[in-house]
Amino acid sequence: MIKNSFISFQEKKEENRGSVEFQVLSFTNKIRRLTSHLELHRKDFLSQRGLRKILGKRQRLLAYLSKKNRVRYKELINQLNIRELKTR
């Protein structure tokens, strides 16, 4: 399915499923799936809560990656077509 294709795509680059990049990739896939679900089911508040939790987890991982390795962070942002973190 979709998850397996993304896993195989990521395994070509690196074999570590616990890496920050892989976790952000899997969270992004979950976010896209939940977003399409919520377009059909607008009043599904439990899914909205789950979406917010996943967004927060992804945001924390991206903040960690941007602090540790800015180059890998930029590559991942461009690869996944997501916006950069807001800096204060």
From Swiss-Prot:
Keywords: Chloroplast, Plastid, Ribonucleoprotein, Ribosomal protein
Subcellular location: Plastid, Chloroplast
Disulfide links within the chain: none
An annotated Gene Ontology molecular function: structural constituent of ribosome
Origin species: Draba nemorosa
GO biological process, one term: translation
CDD domains found in the cross-reference section: Ribosomal_S15p_S13e
Quaternary assembly: Part of the 30S ribosomal subunit.
PROSITE patterns, per the entry: RIBOSOMAL_S15 (PS00362)
Protein name listed in UniProt: Small ribosomal subunit protein uS15c
Gene Ontology CC: chloroplast; ribonucleoprotein complex; ribosome
Principal subcellular localisation of the protein: plastid
Family: Belongs to the universal ribosomal protein uS15 family.
SMART domains xref list: Ribosomal_S15
